[in-house]
Amino acid sequence: MVATPVKQKYDIKDISLAPQGRQRIEWAAREMPVLKQIRERFAQEKPFAGIRLVACCHVTTETANLAIALHAGGADSLLIASNPLSTQDDVAACLVADYGIPVYAIKGEDNETYHRHVQIALDHRPNIIIDDGSDVVATLVQERQHQLSDIIGTTEETTTGIVRLRAMFNDGVLTFPAMNVNDADTKHFYDNRYGTGQSTLDGIIRATNILLAGKTIVVAGYGWCGKGVAMRAKGMGADVIVTEISPVPAIEAAMDGFRVMPMAEAAHQGDIFITVTGNKHVIRPEHFAVMKDGAIVCNSGHFDIEIDLKSLKEQAKEVKEVRNFTEQYILPNGKSIIVIGEGRLVNLAAAEGHPSAVMDMSFANQALACEHLVKNKGQLEPGMHSIPVEVDQEIARLKLQAMGIAIDSLTPEQVEYINSWASGT
């Protein structure tokens, strides 16, 4: 089927920002040696020749390096933002001006613009979709079923997006393969834990200039992202409380040395609240009502639904911006609640997102997942697919090599031992 041509070539803030973006993209590339090796191979082999690809991602310097690698591999690609507040406008400008990649992303774009960009992405009639929260895939299956035959597959690297894809599959609407990048060892062990841990606190500090030492920080959720946030907050001198709904991670948090309690109790004690659950309304009106005056709330989960901001706005008698990306909600009782980044991803709304070195592995997974889909076109069943173990291991090997770290290999005796059942006590 012939693709419907996209009428606009791009929708960005200011193309004159390209030189600044180029400089920052090149700086990020210094910390992304694994993706660099993949890009160089793609440039020679052109695995995506003839493939139309849409990426819905945070438009950052790291994402730019992924987009450049896919472009080098021959992809006819288009990039849109996965979050209205996460776009780095100079990066978007550079991709358009220097690489000819159509980008539809403006920092601070409203929801109408965001959804229009999703529709423009689907007008590209993609064969491969790189999604970040599964908004493009969800729109495709709801509104563009006539395009399903174009799809080779999708990749997804967020916990939130994986939950949505599994729900789609259970409802019988996911009719093509989806690569679960999020659960790759070289993604969630590092991106979710070390990336989220560092960048979340970076966002809070940039937005507030607050001292974390001595503060009580409440971390909602103790998955890999929550573990990273709690670990880094503790390391900066905070007293950390963890809230959970699942007994297993709750025990883990307690054994890691954190206080664990329900949000209803933690709400009285916290100075700063960070949600990392991927679920809805983790912080609600009953929690706002008992928080300290000046309590800070923010989110590091994917969507802006973890904090019930609608209810907070309805309660507030006044809302005012007190710093960039930071709003003060003044309640009828005179107390105030501080919200960072409109309840969206604080690390991208108020900072630059994860460090390049950790995104190197995540985006290596994305690039190789796309290649896996193309190489196995028509052979993968609809539904969720894991990153092949050999791909995960190769990414880890390349990263170790780039870090100058050597490890041991099994001796022949050890290989024989682990493959034998005969040796006992």
UniProtKB/Swiss-Prot annotation:
Q: Any idea which GO molecular function terms this record carries?
A: adenosylhomocysteinase activity
Membrane spanning stretches: none
> Which SMART domains does the UniProt record give?
AdoHcyase (SM00996), AdoHcyase_NAD (SM00997)
- Please give the organism: Synechocystis sp. (strain ATCC 27184 / PCC 6803 / Kazusa)
UniProt binding sites for substrate = 60, 132, 157, 187, 191
Q: What biological-process terms (Gene Ontology) are attached?
A: L-homocysteine biosynthetic process; one-carbon metabolic process; S-adenosylmethionine cycle
Entry's cofactor comment: Binds 1 NAD(+) per subunit.
Cofactors, names only: NAD(+)
Pathway field:
Amino-acid biosynthesis; L-homocysteine biosynthesis; L-homocysteine from S-adenosyl-L-homocysteine: step 1/1
Q: Which InterPro entries match?
A: Adenosylhomocyst_ase-like_sf, Adenosylhomocysteinase-like, Ado_hCys_hydrolase_NAD-bd, NAD(P)-bd_dom_sf, S-Ado-L-homoCys_hydrolase_CS
EC code(s) of this entry: 3.13.2.1
The record's subcellular locations are: Cytoplasm
Keyword vocabulary terms for this entry = Cytoplasm, Hydrolase, NAD, One-carbon metabolism
GO CC annotation: cytosol
Q: Which domain of life is it from?
A: Bacteria
Q: Where does NAD(+) bind?
A: 158-160, 192, 221-226, 244, 279, 300-302, 347
Q: What does this protein do?
A: May play a key role in the regulation of the intracellular concentration of adenosylhomocysteine.
Protein name in the entry: Adenosylhomocysteinase
Q: Name one Pfam family in it.
A: AdoHcyase
Gene this protein is translated from: ahcY
Report the sequence similarity comment from the record: Belongs to the adenosylhomocysteinase family.
What reaction(s) does this enzyme catalyze? S-adenosyl-L-homocysteine + H2O = L-homocysteine + adenosine
